[in-house]
């Protein structure tokens, strides 16, 4: 037991920012980007060494906020500034998944993101009463890119399936026919048919033996100086601007507005320090016009 405790406390790096999913639902990539970076680097290196037939395809990665408050205010990934140990990587990657690579095209990427955007309720701009931003669709299904190479907007005033706007790759509208390799996990690659058909296993080009968590640990060991600039600031998506008559609200960890501010989310405000749920959460609002 002591050996196990010692192992999980093994230092692997250092972070200069608080890596959390507290505001992942409104655009903070702080705990997701390093997972995507690790998955992308791992898959790209394998393809280069072993799969020459895919060497010309861009390799991208998606991941999701696995802990996003379902069980209350403490149910978020939240890694403090300072030393990073193996147990922190387990917080950054909760599940015992393995890395899988799938081949898709630009049209598939849009449809994949449309499915992920079920995370949000449809917001009525004319409604003057409070509207809840987050739906019952689980946070662990809210796949996102976290790279400057891919940019898109999510229009929450639109119905499910029509929310992804201005999707670009390298600054140009994504080519629906262009092929890409996406690094993800075995669960999404084989059980994700509700996202796109190719996520029934048929799109998989490499089923790696390695756990996503171990890939993250290895990546941090190789790149131990983790920083907001390099590992926590690449916002691929934002909400499409919308003027809403009433407040658009969501819950997150108690009194954590400083985390949103540190992530540059100037459109988030604290509405109530105690949202009355008894779960240790606060109520926040997001101004979609900003």
Locations of the language-model features?
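Catalytic centers of hydrolytic enzymes
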Residues: 1-290
């Amino acid at each position: 037991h002591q050996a196990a405790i010692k192992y999980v406390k093994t230092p692997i790096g250092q972070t200069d920012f608080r890596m959390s999913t507290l505001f992942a639902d409104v655009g903070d990539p702080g705990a997701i980007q390093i997972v995507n970076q690790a998955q992308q680097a791992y898959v790209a290196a394998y393809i280069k060494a072993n799969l020459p037939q895919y060497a010309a395809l861009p390799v991208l990665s998606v991941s999701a906020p696995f802990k996003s408050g379902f069980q209350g205010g403490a149910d978020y990934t939240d890694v403090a500034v300072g030393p990073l140990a193996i147990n922190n990587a387990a917080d950054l990657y909760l599940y015992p998944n393995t890395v899988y690579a799938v081949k898709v095209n630009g049209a598939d990427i849009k449809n994949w993101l449309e499915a992920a955007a079920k995370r949000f309720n449809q917001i009525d701009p004319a409604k003057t009463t409070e509207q809840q931003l987050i739906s019952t669709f689980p946070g662990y299904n809210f796949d996102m890119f976290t790279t400057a190479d891919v940019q898109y907007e999510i229009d929450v005033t639109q119905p499910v399936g029509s929310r992804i706007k201005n999707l670009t790759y390298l600054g140009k509208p994504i080519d629906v026919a262009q092929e890409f390799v996406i690094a993800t996990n075995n669960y999404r690659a084989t059980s994700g048919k509700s996202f796109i058909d190719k996520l029934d296993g048929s799109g998989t080009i490499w089923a790696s033996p390695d756990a996503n968590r171990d890939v993250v640990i290895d990546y941090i060991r190789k790149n131990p100086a983790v920083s907001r600039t390099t590992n926590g600031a690449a916002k691929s998506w934002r909400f499409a601007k919308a003027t809403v008559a009433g407040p658009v609200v969501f819950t997150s960890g108690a009194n954590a507005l400083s985390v949103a501010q540190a992530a540059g989310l100037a459109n988030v405000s604290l509405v109530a320090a105690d949202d009355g749920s008894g779960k240790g959460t606060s109520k926040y609002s997001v101004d979609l016009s900003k």
